[in-house]
Each structure stands twice: as C-alpha cells, then as structure tokens.
Amino acid sequence: MHTLIDLPYNSLAPVISDQTLAFHHGKHLQTYVDNLNKLIAGTDLEGKTLEEIVRASAPSVIPSAASVSPAVFNNAGQILNHNLYFTQFAPVPHSGLDPESHLAKQIAKQWSTLDAFKADFESKGTTLFGSGWVWLQANEKGELSIAQYANADNPVAHGLKPLLTFDVWEHAYYLDYQDRKSVV
C-alpha cells in the first residue's frame, strides 16, 4: 500500500505559501495516493514500487501497458513526480547547489554555467503548453538533458533517471501566483 510522503520541512514560504503547500501536498498528492491504492488492489501491481508501476503502465513506451488502465499510470506517475518534487526543496535560506558536487560539474560541462542551465530550465517551464513537468534527467551514460513531459509522464517511463523537477500544473502555483507562470 502506498502512503503520502512526509515533508522534510515545515514551510517553504515565501516562495511557496503554507496554504499552497498544504493544498498541493495534503489534498492533490493524497488523492493520487488514494486513487492508486484503489486501482491496484488485488492486481499484479499491488505491492510493486512506484517505479515498477510506472514502467509497467507507461502506454507511450510499453505496448503491453495498453491492458492496464491509463488511470494507473496517471496516478502512479503523479505520485512519483510529486515525491521527487516535494523532497528536492529546502527551506529558505539555503546555500544552493555545491559547485564542487558531481551534479554541478555535469551541469557546467553541458551548459557551461549554472546560469545558462537555469535559463534553459526556466524556458522549458514557461514554454510548456498545458499541464506537465519539466525535468533534469540523465541517460544510462550519465548525460544530462532537460525535458518537458505532459500530464503524469516522467523520465522513469522512458528509462531515464530523474534528477530535478518542476511542477507546471496550475495547482502548484495558482494560489500564490495566479496565471503568472513566468514568475514561478
């Protein structure tokens, strides 16, 4: 049985309000968890990890997944996406990415500077049409890329490793920023 993750912090204000955090985590994510548990009860997917469920139900990647309800992929994908999203943050103030870390060095190798990476990541977020996610992901060789995925889709469904994500669904920012996606 899947459960709602605990947040590793109490607040992300002033970037994300406590109201948005409570609504996003406690309502949206909880609904995905409840829905997935109902959908997989008594099936071969019960007891599987989120990654296993996403891989087994990704319709765009695995033709045999057509026999699995799209709702399974949508709910499992959203839980996986949100779990990474919520656990990647740290309260303000935070020193940010250690420039000596492996990830920082890989970003510098592929984008020249952290600022160039940030600009590319932000551009992908503000140009994503509709609802979805922006991901920093790595392939099996460790090469990084930034990708836009619609709805519940994610790197795991495509055999890639998710490293960093940003939720571009309106529920993630609307209470704080309304329709100003570009300021998020």
Question: What residues fall within each predicted segment?
Answer:
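Short Pro/Gly-enriched beta-strand edge/turn motifs at strand-loop
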Residues: 114-122
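Near-N-terminal "mature-domain entry" segment
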Residues: 2-60, 71, 77-78
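Conserved small/polar residues in nucleotide/adenosyl-binding loops
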Residues: 183-184
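An amphipathic alpha-helical core segment
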Residues: 123-180
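A cross-taxon signal for low-complexity, glycine/charged-rich
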Residues: 66-69
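Alpha-helical transition-metal enzyme core signature, strongest for iron centers
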Residues: 25-36, 72-86, 110, 114, ...
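A charge-rich, low-complexity, intrinsically flexible signal that marks solvent-exposed coils, linkers
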Residues: 5, 10, 19, 105-109, ...
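Membrane-interface helix-loop-helix modules in multi-pass inner-membrane proteins
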Residues: 88-96
